[in-house]
Design a protein with these regions (language model features):
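Short loop/turn segments that flank or connect secondary-structure elements
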Residues: 1-157
């Protein structure tokens, strides 16, 4: 997969995706979640996250307290040490990574803390969740990060 080309295409489709989000909010189809879930399954049959890892390279997940506790145990350090070394509070008051790419991302695009990764990483790109209508703004933003999300939105149009 040509990740830069896919993301460039998504950037050019931004206006069309905004119109789609507006239309879905104004007239949400009853089967919106089902449609997203079907397109999610289809996209990830073809797209291998390990060939991309753009989410890990460019964005930070939100770390909840439970994520911090789980990851600190996995790394054999105190939660306060994990926060001090890897995290900071963002403008919304959420813990996020200090740096991008993620310090736990290997050169082979594998996550060195995969079993202990935050919930936000486990659920990304969030296109198989319930109540997709409630996260359309997030989904729109994710079209510029994840080629699979861009493809899902393109197919929804």
């Amino acid at each position: 997969m040509d990740v830069p080309a896919a993301l460039n295409r998504a950037a050019h489709e931004r206006k069309a995706n905004r119109k789609l989000v507006s239309r879905l909010r104004d007239r949400p189809p009853k089967d919106l979640d089902y449609r997203f879930h079907q397109l999610h399954e289809e996209a990830f049959r073809d797209i291998d996250c390990l060939e991309c890892a753009n989410c890990c390279k460019t964005t930070s997940p939100i770390f909840r307290d439970i994520d911090i506790d789980r990851l600190s145990r996995h790394l054999g350090m105190r939660p306060a040490e994990l926060v001090e070394r890897y995290l900071h509070l963002d403008a919304e008051g959420d813990y996020v990574l200090n740096v991008a790419p993620c310090p736990f991302l290997g050169p082979d695009n594998y996550c060195s803390v995969y079993e202990a990764r935050p919930r936000a990483c486990r659920e990304y790109p969030h296109t198989d969740r319930k109540n997709m209508l409630g996260i359309l703004s997030l989904t729109l933003r994710n079209t510029l990060v994840c080629p699979a999300v861009a493809r899902i939105m393109r197919r929804l149009r």
